[in-house]
């Protein structure tokens, strides 16, 4: 998902306008030179925007430039490879997301083991996806949709932004937990998938909330539920899918990670400073503009989320026989 150029520039301008925080004096001699923050997606999407907000904050807090380095491709695995190939010295970091966990389970022969080669540093943001349908679909609720899908196995078309994508897996988890058969049709990105959904050639889609808000508000698409465990502040009257499928959670999270064996004191320093940013009202507001909720906590908290999602998505792919082509 990409944001319009005007929105993207507005958010970047907002990052530059964040109040300069005093540099933290610490005995730790880090950083003494620029730090690279690798992003596995092109400029303009939420991952890139979150990275630039955090990079700007850390640059001001720690007195050295944190430079965003976009390495898009292969479900963010190219970006991960750049980090696991770098020295474990804290000068090459990764803006990681749910996509990396899913890609690590989906693709074969990646040349790295994500859970062994990457150490989670700190969460940054949590955001929901939304399950939307074309208005021609008669179902007005999740239970109605499940009933229709059971009555018409293999006939309801589920569009996604591509094979192995996070939105596809949100749909696959729904299919598995609801025990329904939807026909998955992958597209080359959100734009063509949305075109067919709006045109009625596809029936249902799971996608990031910022992409869908305008279509939902204008009635061009009907929202049935959000993929997070709880409701979203953006659409508080919209139920979570988990209210009807207990345990369903396909949250999209973003955070900062480093090469494994990065010194613990560097990990702890970065965690402390990122949490300080997430507690800053201006930075928190910027995250909210792209649908994010601050994901505060220790590196151990983030590691627990990281490990839990790795297990969940790997088990889903095995149980549902989802394999890369």
Task: Describe the predicted segments one by one.
Residues 100-109, 175-177, 203-236:
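A ligand-binding cleft/hinge motif common to bilobed small-molecule-binding domains
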Residues 1-7, 15-29:
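N-terminal twin-arginine translocation
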Residues 85-91, 105-192, 241, 246, ...:
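Hinge/capping helix and adjacent helix->loop/strand transition within the periplasmic-binding protein
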Residues 32-34, 176-178, 217, 240, ...:
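An extracytoplasmic/periplasmic, membrane-proximal ligand-sensing/linker region
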Residues 46, 50, 54, 79, ...:
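Stable alpha-helical elements in mature extracytoplasmic
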Residues 52, 56, 81-82, 172, ...:
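Active-site phosphate/pyrophosphate- and oxyanion-stabilizing loops and adjacent acidic/basic residues
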Residues 26-116, 155, 179-206, 296, ...:
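N-terminal (or domain-start) structured segment
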């Amino acid at each position: 998902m990409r944001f319009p150029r005007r929105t993207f520039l507005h958010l970047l301008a907002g990052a530059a306008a964040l109040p300069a925080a005093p540099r933290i004096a610490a005995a730790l001699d880090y950083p003494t030179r620029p730090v690279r923050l690798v992003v596995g997606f092109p400029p303009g999407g939420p991952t890139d925007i979150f990275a630039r907000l955090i990079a700007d904050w850390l640059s001001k807090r720690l007195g050295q430039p944190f430079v965003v380095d976009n390495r898009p491709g292969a479900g963010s695995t190219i970006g991960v490879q750049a980090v696991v190939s770098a020295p474990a010295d804290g000068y090459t970091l990764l803006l990681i997301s749910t996509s990396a966990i899913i890609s690590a389970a989906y693709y074969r022969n990646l040349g790295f083991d994500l859970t062994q080669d990457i150490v989670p540093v700190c969460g940054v943001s949590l955001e929901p996806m939304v399950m939307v349908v074309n208005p021609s679909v008669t179902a007005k609720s999740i239970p109605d949709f499940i009933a229709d899908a059971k009555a018409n196995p293999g006939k309801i078309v589920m569009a996604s932004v591509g094979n192995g994508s996070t939105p596809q897996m949100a749909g696959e988890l729904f299919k598995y937990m609801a025990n329904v058969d939807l026909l998955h049709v992958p597209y080359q990105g959100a734009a063509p998938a949305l075109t067919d959904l709006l045109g009625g050639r596809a029936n249902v889609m799971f996608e990031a909330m910022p992409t869908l808000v305008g279509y939902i508000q204008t009635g061009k698409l009907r929202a049935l539920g959000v993929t997070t465990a709880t409701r979203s502040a953006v659409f508080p009257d919209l139920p979570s899918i988990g209210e009807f499928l207990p345990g369903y959670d396909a949250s999209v999270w973003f955070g900062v990670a480093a090469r494994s064996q990065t010194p613990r004191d560097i990990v702890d320093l970065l965690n402390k400073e990122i949490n300080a940013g997430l507690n800053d009202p201006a930075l928190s507001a910027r995250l909210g503009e792209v649908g994010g909720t601050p994901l505060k906590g220790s590196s151990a908290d983030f590691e627990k989320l990281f490990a839990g999602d790795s297990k969940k998505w790997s088990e889903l792919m095995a149980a549902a026989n989802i394999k890369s082509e």
